[in-house]
Design a protein with these regions (language model features):
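Alpha-helical segment that forms one wall of the substrate-binding/catalytic cleft
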Residues: 19-27
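Helical element adjacent to the flavin cofactor pocket in flavoenzyme catalytic cores
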Residues: 56-67, 89-151, 155
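Alpha-helix capping and helix-loop boundary segments enriched in small/acidic/polar residues
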Residues: 12-15, 100-103, 167
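Residue-level signal for pocket-adjacent positions within structured domains
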Residues: 4, 43, 77, 81, ...
Length: 191
């Protein structure tokens, strides 16, 4: 993914984007703590390698993060170390990032929405925006009328369609993958 960002943003732009992503993780943790959001926030994430070639790629990624992005925190776990953590010898190894993290995304969103409401923000659900005007007196045009506000946040996923064509040209596709289960417990996780 970073190759794509370097092509589109240049070397310095890609570094800035990486740094922003690192800062965003700290912001998430701060918001979870400040607002008491119950979203199973946990620090640490491991990219695992199924094939030896995948592990070689993770090794290169670790080096690139350290050299190009001044991010020396990732640890390459060989098969034995990863197996000890996961209880499975299925993987060749993995790249563990202790500063990254994971959470339950829906619960995080619901917690942010509640924090916004607690701060006096009005959230209009199931009210599609047809058009908006930004600036000093933002205005949103909806089917049933207009919404005036002091600040406007476009929170419509990555694809806003005709609502914000200027933003559509600036969106870069990024894949995210989430699986959420109830907590398994130690015995069940090891089985």
């Amino acid at each position: 993914e970073m190759d794509t960002f370097r092509q589109q943003l240049g070397e310095q732009g890609a570094r800035q984007l990486w740094q922003m992503s690192v800062e965003a993780i700290d912001m998430i943790e701060q918001r979870v703590t400040q607002h008491g959001i119950a979203c199973d926030w946990t620090r640490g994430f491991c990219n695992v390698a199924v094939k030896p070639a995948h592990l070689a790629g993770l090794r290169e990624w670790q080096q690139e993060l350290a050299d190009r992005y001044q991010y020396p925190y990732c640890q390459l776990w060989e098969r034995e170390q990863l197996a000890a953590v996961l209880g499975s010898a299925r993987y060749q190894g993995g790249l563990y990032d202790p500063l990254s993290g994971h959470l339950h995304p829906l619960n995080y969103l619901l917690g942010l929405a509640q924090a916004a409401r607690d701060a006096g923000v009005a959230i209009y659900e199931n009210t599609p925006a047809l058009a908006f005007r930004s600036g000093e007196a933002p205005l949103v045009q909806c089917e049933g009328g207009k919404v005036r506000c002091r600040q406007l946040v476009l929170a419509g996923n990555a694809y806003l369609g005709k609502l914000a064509p200027a933003l559509n040209r600036r969106i870069m596709p990024v894949g995210t993958y989430v699986i959420a289960t109830e907590p398994l417990g130690e015995a069940r996780a090891r089985s």
